[in-house]
């Protein structure tokens, strides 16, 4: 039975609730309050998210910084270890030299004393080597005082040697807080002390004295002092089981240093085998250099058919030659990847990867295959350790030292300068606060050796690079605008109107509807040859009609899938898109329009005749072989004698053309494909380089320049880079300049030399002023303004071609000051007079 509620309680509440519900409405104040609460909630949530994001960024930054410090500590361990070993070895070498000198002095003194005694007393019979006479008495030869003095000296020497080595370790342990830059300076100084350049008193090569450190099996030449230093650096890495990168500038003899290192290893009793892996085009040079400098060391060119390579594999394990050692195996990247299963079972004493920047992509097959090779030591040879971004440099370091360089994201996030959107002042402030670039220099110190031509004071004339901005011609402007607007196809398709065939009903016929006489086809259509023979006459008749009906006025090369390539072709020459054809001869139309339709050709047409008149020889590089074809037409038009080199030519043709250019004074221009002629050729007969179109990778153009700016060049070299202003051509150059800036910051020209070379020992960090100069450096020193009608005036042309200051500098034998000059051609109105600003 339910409990009874108190009287009067329920009756009074129910009417009140009903009344409240009847009168409840949503007022504007309530709506405003709801909106305010919602806005406050969103603001509170936004602040929480912002706080969480800032906290996460701070924590992630701290985590990455700790990883960076850990990487630096690991690199410090290598540096300190190398330094300790090198200083110990230096002390041991010094002790050995002192002992030899004392022994020589004692022999001289003893010889003089014996000669005096011989004149007064009877001659003393010499004793045989060994311990045959047990009654041998030392007192017969030396007095008691001499014995005691020698024993005392030996005891003191042993104590000094032990204490010095102990003190070295204690000193090294006490200096754990040393920065890697100080270690680098000590390391460099130790290398210099170990390689003091003095000549062997006995050995000579072609009448010239040989450096004392040059290996005895290196008999084909005399090593330069910086090559001896490089060999000593490689020796230190090899003796301590550390891999490295030899990144000397092109033309300094990286191949010679490697050959000398292998000869030194053989001299130390290492029988091999050794493996050299590189591009196919470099293999003949490796074989020739080994034969030239170390003829006693056996080599093997591992190439050929599969059966031939199977026989060669068995010969790797056989000892050959007068030295009875395993051969130096030289092979290409492709063969190394294909025969990895056979080659990876060999225990290579030394693995050299030539053109090491080929493994800049850590995901490529080549780096995966090479990592499986069993090698005691690995060495990468590259003149361009940093080409595009830091991930490429990290890929090289990861291949050599996977235990040290194992975190790409942290490495790249800290050091990728191209990802920074801050101004130069912000970058400098960040560098002052965190010293990131300084840390990177410290980390790379033990593993990278890079010297420039200016560092080693070679007899190489100065070089200047000049960038010339060319305008667009009227035809180029039309094509360029049409390509950007994607209407270029209409320009060539509108004139070719297709004849429309109508059906009996008045509608256009479908293209697939063709009258076919099936009675001519047998009942067995599987006979394919018979079917083709029956249809072919009809196809030939249709083709003949098409060829007659369409007049050939020009050759059109239009591929709309790659707009960027079309824009580049338009900047180079509009004939790459549409080359006019002479209607009479049906050959390419070569006349003055070939020059006037391209802004770059207008520049060339002003420069080349004057260069020829002054006795210069020109290398003209282009990325496109089709562009070389048009340049050949221009040379025929102006009666310029020329040679050519591209990737499609055979080895004999290349040799013939290079010999012709280097020896024949009448050959004025050498047309070269940048990629085909960028490596392995010597064209020092030229003193002028013209880069017609720049590469996205600035190192490709630098390699091209070094074909003539190298050892053996006797004249100053000027490099002209042609750029079409305000186009994709200029964007490519600017992008390449950004990559060069990254290289200048990371692979600093005052670091990784293997010597101090004027470095301040107390300078531990990058100078902010120096960093600002790198970030805000101007790439030009002159501007020339002119109208389109006259691209370059006579006065400006004289400034452009003048190299008298370089000649004076070379004759004075003063320090070569690197300069960058740009002649910038700007479009002005016709009434504006040319102006020259300095």
Curated annotation (Swiss-Prot):
* PTM annotation (Phosphoserine): residues: 115, 503, 515
Tissues in which the protein is found:
Highly expressed in proliferative tissues such as adult thymus and testis, and expressed at lower levels in uterus, small intestine, colon, and peripheral blood mononuclear cells. Also expressed in neoplastic cell lines including those derived from myeloid and lymphoid leukemias.
An example of a GO molecular function for this protein is: hydrolase activity
- Motif location (DEAH box)? 354-357
* InterPro entries found in the cross-reference section: Helicase_ATP-bd, Helicase_C-like, HELLS_N, P-loop_NTPase, SNF2-like_sf, SNF2/RAD54-like_C, SNF2_N
Biased composition, class Basic and acidic residues, residue ranges: 94-108, 119-134
**What does the UniProt entry list as the effect of changing residue 699 to R?**
In ICF4; uncertain significance
Enzyme Commission code(s) on record: 3.6.4.-
Mind listing the GO biological process terms from this record?
apoptotic process; cell division; cellular response to leukemia inhibitory factor; chromosomal DNA methylation maintenance following DNA replication; DNA methylation-dependent constitutive heterochromatin formation; kidney development; lymphocyte proliferation; negative regulation of gene expression via chromosomal CpG island methylation
Task: Supply one GO CC term from the record.
Answer: chromosome, centromeric region
Q: What induces it?
A: By concanavalin-A in peripheral blood leukocytes.
Residues forming coiled coils: 30-115
Outline the segment boundaries, as ranges, of region: Disordered: 94-135
State where the protein is found: Nucleus
Q: Which keywords does UniProt give here?
A: ATP-binding, Cell cycle, Cell division, Coiled coil, Developmental protein, Disease variant, Helicase, Hydrolase, Mitosis, Nucleotide-binding, Nucleus, Phosphoprotein, Transcription, Transcription regulation
* The protein's role, per its UniProt record: Plays an essential role in normal development and survival. Involved in regulation of the expansion or survival of lymphoid cells. Required for de novo or maintenance DNA methylation. May control silencing of the imprinted CDKN1C gene through DNA methylation. May play a role in formation and organization of heterochromatin, implying a functional role in the regulation of transcription and mitosis.
State the family it belongs to: Belongs to the SNF2/RAD54 helicase family.
Instruction: Enumerate the PANTHER family for this protein.
Output: LYMPHOID-SPECIFIC HELICASE
The name this protein carries in UniProt is: Lymphoid-specific helicase
């Amino acid at each position: 039975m339910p409990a009874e509620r108190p009287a009067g309680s329920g009756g009074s509440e129910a009417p009140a609730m009903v009344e409240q519900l009847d009168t409840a409405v949503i007022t504007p104040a309530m709506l405003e309050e709801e909106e305010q609460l919602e806005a406050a909630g969103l603001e509170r949530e936004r602040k929480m998210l912002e706080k969480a994001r800032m906290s996460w960024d701070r924590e992630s930054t701290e985590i990455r910084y700790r990883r960076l410090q850990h990487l630096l500590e690991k690199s410090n361990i290598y540096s300190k270890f190398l330094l300790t070993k090198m200083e110990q070895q230096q002390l041991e070498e010094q002790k050995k030299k002192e002992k030899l000198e004392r022994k020589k002095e004692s022999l001289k003194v003893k010889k003089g004393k014996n000669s005096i005694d011989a004149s007064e007393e009877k001659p003393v019979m010499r004793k045989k080597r060994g311990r045959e006479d047990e009654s041998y008495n030392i007192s017969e030869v030396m007095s008691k005082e001499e014995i005691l003095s020698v024993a005392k000296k030996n005891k003191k020497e042993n104590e000094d040697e032990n204490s010095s080595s102990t003190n070295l370790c204690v000193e090294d342990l006490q200096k754990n807080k040393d920065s890697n830059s100080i270690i680098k300076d000590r390391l460099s100084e130790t290398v210099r002390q170990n390689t003091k350049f003095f000549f062997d008193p006995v050995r000579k090569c072609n009448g010239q004295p040989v450096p004392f450190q040059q290996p005895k099996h290196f008999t084909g030449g005399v090593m330069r002092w910086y090559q001896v230093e490089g060999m000593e650096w490689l020796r230190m890495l090899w003796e301590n089981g550390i891999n490295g990168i030899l990144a000397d500038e092109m033309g300094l003899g990286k191949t010679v240093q490697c050959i000398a290192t292998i000869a030194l290893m053989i001299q130390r009793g290492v029988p091999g085998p050794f493996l050299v892996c590189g591009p196919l085009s470099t293999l003949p040079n490796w074989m020739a250099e080994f034969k030239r400098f170390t003829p006693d060391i056996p080599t093997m060119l591992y190439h050929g058919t599969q059966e031939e390579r199977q026989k060669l594999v068995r010969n790797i394990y056989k000892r050959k030659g007068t030295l009875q050692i395993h051969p130096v195996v030289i092979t290409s990247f492709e063969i190394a990847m294909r025969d990895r299963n056979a080659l990876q079972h060999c225990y290579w004493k030394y693995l050299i990867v030539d053109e090491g920047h080929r493994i800049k992509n850590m995901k490529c097959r080549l780096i995966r295959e090479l990592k499986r090779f069993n090698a005691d030591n690995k060495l990468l040879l590259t003149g361009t350790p940093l080409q595009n971004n830091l991930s490429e440099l990290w890929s090289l370091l990861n291949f050599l030292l996977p235990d040290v360089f194992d975190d790409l994201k942290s490495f790249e996030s800290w050091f990728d300068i191209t990802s920074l959107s801050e101004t130069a002042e912000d970058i400098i402030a960040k560098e002052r606060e965190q010293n990131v670039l300084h840390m990177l220099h410290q980390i790379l110190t033990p593993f990278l050796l890079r010297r420039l031509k200016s560092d080693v004071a070679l007899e190489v004339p100065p070089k200047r690079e000049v960038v010339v901005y060319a305008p667009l011609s009227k035809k180029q402007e039309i094509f360029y605008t049409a390509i950007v607007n994607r209407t270029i196809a209409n320009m060539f398709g509108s004139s070719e109107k297709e004849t429309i065939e109508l059906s009996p009903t008045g509608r256009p016929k479908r293209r697939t509807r063709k009258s076919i006489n099936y009675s001519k086809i047998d009942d067995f259509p599987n006979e394919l040859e018979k079917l083709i023979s029956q249809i072919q006459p009809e196809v030939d008749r249709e083709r003949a009609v098409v060829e007659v009906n369409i007049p050939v006025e020009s050759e059109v090369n239009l591929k709309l899938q790659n707009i960027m390539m079309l824009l580049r072709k338009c900047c180079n020459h509009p004939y790459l898109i549409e080359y006019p054809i002479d209607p009479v001869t049906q050959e390419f139309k070569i006349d003055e329009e070939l020059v006037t339709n391209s802004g770059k050709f207008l520049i060339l047409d002003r420069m080349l005749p004057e260069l020829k008149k002054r006795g210069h020889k020109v290398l003209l590089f282009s990325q496109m072989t089709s562009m070389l074809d048009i340049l050949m037409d221009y040379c025929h038009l102006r009666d310029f004698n020329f040679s050519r080199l591209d990737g499609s030519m055979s080895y004999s043709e290349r040799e013939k053309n290079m010999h012709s250019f280097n020896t024949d004074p009448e050959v004025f221009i050498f047309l070269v494909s940048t990629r085909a002629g960028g490596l392995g050729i010597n064209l020092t007969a030229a003193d002028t380089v013209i880069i017609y179109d720049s590469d996205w990778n600035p190192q490709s153009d630098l390699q091209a320049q070094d074909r003539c700016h190298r050892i053996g060049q006797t004249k100053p070299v000027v490099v002209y880079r042609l750029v079409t202003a305000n186009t994709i051509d200029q964007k490519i150059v600017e992008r390449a300049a950004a990559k060069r800036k990254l290289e200048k910051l990371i692979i600093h020209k005052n670091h990784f030399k293997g010597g101090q070379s004027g470095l301040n020992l107390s300078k531990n960090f990058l100078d902010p002023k120096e960093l600002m100069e790198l970030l805000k450096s101007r790439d030009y020193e002159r501007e020339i303004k002119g109208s389109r009608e006259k691209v370059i005036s006579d006065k400006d042309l004289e400034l452009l071609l003048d190299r008298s200051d370089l000649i004076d500098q070379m004759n004075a034998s003063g320090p070569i000051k690197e300069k960058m000059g740009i002649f910038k051609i700007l479009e002005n109105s016709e009434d504006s007079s040319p102006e020259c600003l300095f």
